[in-house]
Regions:
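Claisen-condensing/thiolase-fold acyl-transfer catalytic domains that form or cleave C-C bonds
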Residues: 1-154
Length: 154
């Protein structure tokens, strides 16, 4: 992992409403997705970039789901090799993974990357009629995070 294969730190902005279904509907907003569950794990700092794999494995174990049941995966690519590692270790088909570009191609705006990933996941489920998406990223010093979202579009 070097600066040559890392995502650029870029500017970015975005907004997303997050709330309970009841509060959203009360205010005339129809939810497009719901957060089902999430996990955070740690790996040795020397394995920075590996965190998404155990985070996704733990999330799947918690929810009782399997890779084939997930319609879309959005994995932040702070470094290009992270996505290749996740695909290889978990057997994620390329046609269900980071279809809209990631940190290397569109940039990595601090504080907005997670929102961009969530918006990609929600939009993919909405457009394809898929049910589940997993969003995942590695965090500094060997951490990994994964979140499962479910399509709520009618």
């Amino acid at each position: 992992m070097t600066a040559g294969n890392s995502s650029g730190v870029t500017d970015g902005a975005g907004a997303m409403l997050v709330g309970t279904r009841e509060s959203m509907e009360k205010n005339g907003v129809m939810p497009e997705a719901r957060v089902v569950d999430w996990t955070v794990v740690g790996v040795p700092p020397s394995l920075m970039g590996h965190g998404p794999v155990p985070a996704i494995e733990k999330l799947l174990a918690k929810t009782g789901l399997t890779i084939p049941e997930i319609d879309y995966f959005e994995v932040n690519e702070a470094f290009a090799v992270v996505n290749l590692h996740v695909e290889a270790q978990l057997g994620i088909p390329r046609d269900r993974h980071n279809l809209y570009g990631g940190g290397v191609s569109v940039g990595h705006p601090p504080g907005v990357t997670g929102l961009r990933m969530a918006m990609n996941g929600v939009q993919h489920l909405k457009e394809t009629g898929g049910r589940y998406a997993i969003l995942s990223m590695c965090l500094g010093a060997g951490q990994g995070l994964a979140m499962l979202i479910e399509n709520s579009s009618d």
